[in-house]
UniProtKB/Swiss-Prot annotation:
Alphabetic keyword roster: Ribonucleoprotein, Ribosomal protein, RNA-binding, rRNA-binding
GO molecular function list: mRNA binding; rRNA binding; structural constituent of ribosome
Name listed for the protein in its UniProt record: Small ribosomal subunit protein uS3
Subunit architecture: Part of the 30S ribosomal subunit. Forms a tight complex with proteins S10 and S14.
Species of the source: Carsonella ruddii
Name of the coding gene: rpsC
Pfam families: Ribosomal_S3_C (PF00189)
NCBIfam families on file: rpsC_bact
Family assignment from sequence similarity: Belongs to the universal ribosomal protein uS3 family.
RNA-binding listed as a keyword: yes
Function summary: Binds the lower part of the 30S subunit head. Binds mRNA in the 70S ribosome, positioning it for translation.
Amino acid sequence: MGKKINPILFRLKKNTVYHSLWYTFKKNFCYYLKCDILIREIIRRNFLFINLSYIDIIISNKLTINLYINNVDQFNIIENYLDVFVFQISKILKKNVILNFVFNHVLNAKNIAYNVVNQILNKNSIKKIIKEELLKNRKNFGCKIQISGRLEGVDIARKEWSLIGRIPLHTIKYNLEYYQCETLTQYGILGIKIWLFKKNNEK
């Protein structure tokens, strides 16, 4: 069971915080869900060059968006675009928008995937990429990186993965992060999956 289901979904009720914090009646649920998806899509489209750790969306009388970033320098890059972004969101949803930035220095699975994608686009060796990222995360209890597809232009698609520490997929009480994404190369699409076993008090 633990190997088939998404690890975040498996632990959602126990020790994982959901990043869409809003409640509504059944008749309005579809509208709020569309708003949530639309906001995340606009954020990804506008801040494509920024490595966002998490996006928290809180909808009530006002719309509150918390963006978690790892580097203060990233905030300086997007500072000039914030007014346009807030205006765009408030115009679509017709709500007052509060935008908060939270500087989160704890590395998570999405940050690792972001680094892996950048190194793949720079045409580094797949085995070298995985080895370097695992060494960076050796302070965690466990980390697993898997890259699949036509690696380095080979004719037959394959998987390359490596693990440091342990990844307890079946134990719900442990703080386990998971992230998957895709990147387009000249040989086709590569799939990237990250499992990260962190300390329970880390976000």
